[in-house]
Regions:
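Short, intrinsically disordered, charge-balanced linker/junction segments flanking boundaries
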Residues: 177-180
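N-terminal, post-cleavage mature segments of outer-membrane
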Residues: 26, 46-50, 57
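Short glycine/threonine-rich beta-strand-turn micro-motifs
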Residues: 29-34, 52, 62-122, 136-173
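Structural signature for extended repeat/solenoid scaffolds and their inter-repeat hinge/linker regions
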Residues: 41-45
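Structural boundary/hinge residues at secondary-structure and domain interfaces
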Residues: 35-39
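Cleaved targeting-peptide boundary
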Residues: 19-25
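Long, folded non-catalytic interaction modules
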Residues: 124-129
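Gram-negative bacterial Sec-dependent N-terminal signal peptides
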Residues: 1-17
Length: 180
């Protein structure tokens, strides 16, 4: 009876391992197809993605209040790009991430020169939203693009001469000199 139980446990754990391994392989294939990279690069990218949190926490702390955006580039290789408000020497870093079994270098590009931090952008979003609400009643989305610093307010409506005049008026009232 013990042998049957041990064999059953061994078989079920083997099936679980095979299923989880199959899921990992499917993730690698999907990433490879989505981003147009080979499976080795996809495997590396997924590993870095899974182990990046502590590195991002350290970057957030180092540049506290000055980060304009953080985003991922997948081509030609996986890397994290950090846009920083103000001036400085752009730099490339490799931060070791991983676990007890495996480690890898997480490439991070620090790019200076952003005009506003995320916090300032949120304030500008609120200001823009108030102005837009005065002219349009059908706001669809409000967003901040961390890659380029653009603030976008989308409204439902047609591009009529009247609506385009409203947009020009809103931009004039908004008067944000830090727009990209």
């Amino acid at each position: 009876m013990k042998k049957i139980l041990a064999l059953t446990i061994l078989i079920s754990s083997s099936c679980t391992f095979a299923a989880s391994n199959e899921g990992i392989e499917q993730g690698i294939r999907s990433y490879s197809l989505l981003h147009g990279v080979n499976t080795a690069e996809a495997n590396k990218a997924l590993f870095l993605e899974a182990n990046r949190d502590s590195a991002l926490d350290a970057i957030e702390e180092e540049f506290k209040g000055r980060i304009a955006g953080i985003y991922i580039e997948n081509l030609p290789t996986y890397k994290i790009v950090v846009r920083v408000k103000g001036y400085g020497q752009n730099e490339k870093r490799n931060i070791v991430v991983g676990n007890a079994i495996s480690k890898g270098d997480l490439p991070i590009d620090i790019q200076y020169g952003a005009k506003e931090s995320r916090e300032e952008a949120i304030s500008q979003i609120n200001k823009a939203l108030k102005l837009v609400k005065n002219s349009f009643y059908t706001i669809q989305t409000v967003s901040y693009n961390e890659k380029n610093g653009n603030i976008v307010v989308e409204v439902k409506g047609k591009s009529t001469v009247e609506n385009l005049k409203k947009v020009d008026e809103i931009q004039s009232l908004w008067n944000n000199p830090n727009l990209p």
